[in-house]
Design a protein with these regions (language model features):
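Extreme N-terminal starter segment of soluble prokaryotic enzymes
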Residues: 2-5
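Conserved acetyl-CoA-binding loop-helix of GNAT-fold acetyltransferases
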Residues: 82, 88-101, 216-227
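Conserved GNAT acetyl-CoA-binding A-motif
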Residues: 96, 101-115, 229-238
Length: 291
């Protein structure tokens, strides 16, 4: 099957969204509207065409990370999707290969994505950030702190202080935080803070799942959320000691990284290879975004 790989035009953006919704039907009820309006753009989309029809697409979203005392320009690879009837014809592989070549030429330091070791390892991706998973029953919560709905400005202040202890975290702006808050509102989720930490969460059958937690002291916030919602599940960067007697339930490989210009990626880090960088020897690695 001979495919044409190219960037889409603005007039093809709607078709890229249609491909996304077919491949990720769980997003079609609302998330994709938000994602295509606020998280991606036509210029980020690389697509595969067969006989003039868009059959697959990939989003390479700018993703600056804090590393080596500065900011390294990377991309987050998201939404790698192929229409079901065209799978197993190497469309995704051709998209990833073309994307890497283009980004390497642009001087992009690395590509980062949500893990799928069995697929992405073949393209040069290695594990980057790991998170420990925890469960906190409401009965084990501590002393609650007064909480409030957070703002983008407050989130950025907390995030900036929190990220100083890690390497590899996204260099976020207040606008980024506004976009995350908009996503939470659109999806009926919650964003709370006690001034020391913030949490983005959604309700579950048992309580709530916190999908982003940042802050040096999370005890008061977690206690208040457990009192409000019930049992909590949340994640912390690997080897972080939780501030409450939460039960560790496992670990998750949270992101993978592929060096595209390794000299740029490693500059001023002390590491000689990306594997060394990811090992944690030159700083604790943390990422919070899936895409």
């Amino acid at each position: 099957m001979e495919l044409t790989i190219r960037h889409i035009g603005a007039d093809e953006y709607g078709e890229a969204k249609r491909v996304w919704n077919i491949c990720f039907p769980e997003d079609a009820s609302g998330y994709s509207d938000y994602y295509f309006a606020r998280r991606t753009m036509a210029e980020y989309v690389l697509a595969a065409f067969y006989e003039g029809k868009m059959i697959a697409a990939l989003h390479a979203i700018p993703y600056p990370i804090m590393l080596g005392g500065g900011t390294k320009n990377c991309v987050m690879i998201a939404g790698v999707a192929t229409l079901p009837e065209y799978r197993h014809h190497m469309a995704a592989a051709q998209l990833i290969t073309a994307c890497h070549a283009e980004q390497k030429q642009k001087g992009t330091a690395a590509a980062i994505l949500k893990p799928d070791v069995n697929f992405y390892e073949q393209f040069g991706y290695i594990p980057f950030a790991w998170h420990d998973e925890y469960r906190l029953p409401w009965i084990d919560a501590g002393i609650p702190a007064p909480i409030h709905e957070t703002t983008a400005e407050e989130m950025l202040k907390i995030y900036s202080a929190f990220s100083a202890d890690y390497i590899g975290m996204m260099a976020r702006t207040e606008q980024d935080m506004e976009i995350y808050l908009e996503g939470a509102r659109r999806l009926g989720e919650y964003a709370y803070s006690d001034g020391k930490a913030y949490a983005l969460l959604n309700e579950t059958d048992y309580g709530a799942d916190i999908y982003e937690l940042a802050g040096a002291d999370t005890a008061g916030l977690l206690s208040s959320l457990a009192e409000e919602f019930g049992a909590l599940t949340f994640r912390l960067p690997r080897d972080t000691i939780p501030s409450l007697p939460a039960m560790r339930t496992g670990e998750i490989m949270f992101s993978m990284i592929c060096p595209l210009n390794e000299d740029i990626l490693l500059e001023n880090t002390g590491a000689q290879t990306t594997e060394e960088l990811a090992s944690g020897e030159y700083g604790r690695v943390c990422t919070l975004e899936f895409c």
